[in-house]
Curated annotation (Swiss-Prot):
The lineage of its organism: Bacteria, Bacillati, Actinomycetota, Actinomycetes, Mycobacteriales. CDD domains: Radical_SAM. Binds 2 [4Fe-4S] clusters. One cluster is coordinated with 3 cysteines and an exchangeable S-adenosyl-L-methionine. Residues 24-140 form the MTTase N-terminal domain. Residues 402-470 form the TRAM domain. This is tRNA-2-methylthio-N(6)-dimethylallyladenosine synthase 2. GO terms for cellular component: cytosol. [4Fe-4S] cluster 1 binds at C33, C69, C103.
Length: 532
């Protein structure tokens, strides 16, 4: 669907009145899940290929692109609040352009312009590649452009990319989702699952490694389903395709770490566990959303598994990889949740001993079956349960981290992970299991992207401390690239990291696939992340 809407006085002027395209700068603001981060890198790549350049930090961009999330009312309010903040600048700088894409744009469509008529471009989740042309058309014609495709036009991974990191990269293996969780709006916004071919994925991974990337995260709404809906009709369905893909990644020289997100417990199979355990560069980390420990609530959520099956998967994972870090997503206050249901969730959390849990308070979202269910709970009840769950998980996380004190861990040095690093003279990195470690680098030239070995000296619920200095340091091509200025700012390494602080306020987003999409829960995360 394509439509145009005439702007008022705040619209962009004709091309002759505007500064040359080569001088125009851009900024992409991302809300939501890791799939949106992946897509934002593509938006940035498209703009740079079209002659735009990234705006310097602290400066006003000529083009501001919002890549949105549609999972909660909070996400809506945040977007429209930020758009309102730009309205005065739009009035005084008519050549400045605003574009809104992502899931909220796919959902609201023309309604977005009624709420924010100063927006220049609205585009959806299926036609990211149209962004430069839509901006150009809106700028030349002084008419807002709304283009929402109903089906995927091109895999985002095939588009140009301006990646945020020299050492870690997202690699999408599929788009869309075939599940029907009652709290999730993703299938209606991103469509049914479509899988990329293994050859395309492995070619992208190889090209990334050739540029110095040492860690990749495979992205999908439900990575376990990979292989059932290949875009290429010549490829047969293959239920074992994801395990085969993990093993194939293990054959790529120079690729040191492989992560993935997110699996669905209903389709988690033992061949994936075997591939994880037997492929050295696949990290001993698993983020597997639970959502609730109550079988009755899981049934109402249409999650297609029960607590016993979930705990059985964890048991088999730990049997194969005893030191694996397992994290999860939890929704508190789903419609009809009783105190008995909540107690069942607490019980499963105690048994599972998660390294971290990304916990969110439910809020109903129009367009999801759960929004129509009876038994919507009072906010006070949900908040009280949420606080109890976070307290329990904090205790479990701290106990798990304290058990690592005295151990040596290998870190991929990161940038932008520790807010207090400058004050404490520490740097930060991620262990192979995803834990965040703050360490003292000493006087050596340690760069983001390098590999260091340290000994853990202290622990907190969301991070580890290594103040004993560096025991080993390996310089990498990724570190060289970072030192050469080939990265702008850091991104998280793989799936929600173990080690972000408790923030008892509404989180950026929730999701039906922690990296792959967005669901319909609301609230704060005991470790900021997105639920599946």
């Amino acid at each position: 669907m394509t439509s145009t809407v005439a702007h008022g006085a705040g619209s962009a002027g004709p091309a002759d009145d505007a500064e040359p395209m080569s001088a125009r700068t851009y900024q992409v603001r991302t809300y939501g899940c890791q799939m949106n981060v992946h897509d934002s890198e593509r938006m940035a790549g498209l703009l740079e290929a079209a002659g735009y350049r990234r705006a310097a930090e602290g400066t006003d961009a000529d083009v501001v692109v919002f890549n949105t999330c549609a999972v909660r009312e909070n996400a809506d309010n945040k977007l429209y609040g930020n758009l309102s903040h730009l309205a005065p600048r739009k009035r005084t700088s008519p050549d400045m352009q605003i574009a809104v894409g992502g899931c909220l744009a796919q959902k609201d469509r023309d309604a977005l312009l009624r709420k924010a008529p100063w927006v220049d471009v609205v585009f959806g989740t299926h036609n990211i590649g149209s962004l430069p042309a839509l901006l150009d058309r809106a700028r030349h014609n002084r008419v807002a452009q709304v283009e929402i495709a109903e089906a995927l036009q091109q895999f985002p991974s095939s588009l140009p990319s301006a990646r945020e990191s020299a050492y870690a990269a997202w690699v999408s293996i599929s788009v869309g989702c075939n599940n029907t969780c009652t709290f999730c709006i993703v299938p209606s916004l991103r469509g049914k699952e479509i899988d990329r071919s293994p050859a395309d994925i492995l070619a992208e991974v190889q090209s990334l490694v050739d540029t110095g990337v040492v860690e990749i995260t495979l992205l999908g709404q439900n990575v376990n389903a990979y292989g059932v809906s290949f875009a290429d009709p010549a490829l047969p369905r293959n239920r074992g395709a994801f395990a085969e893909l993990l093993r194939a990644c293990g054959d790529i020289d120079g690729l040191e770490r492989v992560r993935f997100t997110s699996p669905h417990p209903a389709e988690f199979t033992d061949d994936v566990i075997e591939a994880m355990a037997q492929t050295p560069n696949v990290c001993p980390a698993l983020h597997m959303p639970l959502q609730s420990g109550s079988d009755r609530v899981l049934r109402a959520m249409r999650r297609s598994y029960r607590a016993e099956r979930y705990l059985g998967i964890i048991e088999r994972v730990r049997a194969a990889m005893p030191h694996a870090a397992i994290t999860t997503d939890l929704i508190v206050g789903f419609p009809g949740e009783t105190e008995q249901d909540f107690a069942a969730t607490l019980d499963v959390v105690r048994q599972a001993r998660f390294s971290a849990a990304f916990t969110f308070q439910y809020s109903k979202r129009p367009g999801t079956p759960a929004a129509e269910l009876d038994g919507q709970l009072p906010k006070a009840v949900v908040q009280e349960r949420y606080e109890r769950l976070v307290e329990l998980q904090e205790q479990i996380s701290l106990e798990g981290n304290r058990a690592i004190v005295g151990q040596r861990v290998e870190l991929l040095v990161a940038t932008g992970e520790g807010r207090k690093d400058t004050l404490t003279a520490r740097m930060s990195g991620r262990a192979r299991d995803g834990r965040l470690v703050h360490f003292r680098a000493g006087d050596g030239p340690v760069r983001p992207g390098d590999i260091v070995t340290v000994e853990v000296t202290d622990a907190a619920p969301h991070h580890l401390i290594a103040d004993g200095g560096i025991l080993a340091h390996r310089r990498t091509r990724a570190g060289d690239a970072h030192a050469d200025g080939q990265t702008v700012r850091g991104i998280g390494l793989g799936m929600p990291g173990i080690g972000r602080p408790v923030v008892p306020v509404a989180a950026e987003a929730t999701s039906c696939g922690s990296a792959g999409g967005c669901g319909s829960a609301d609230g704060a995360g005991s470790s900021a992340g997105d639920p599946q």
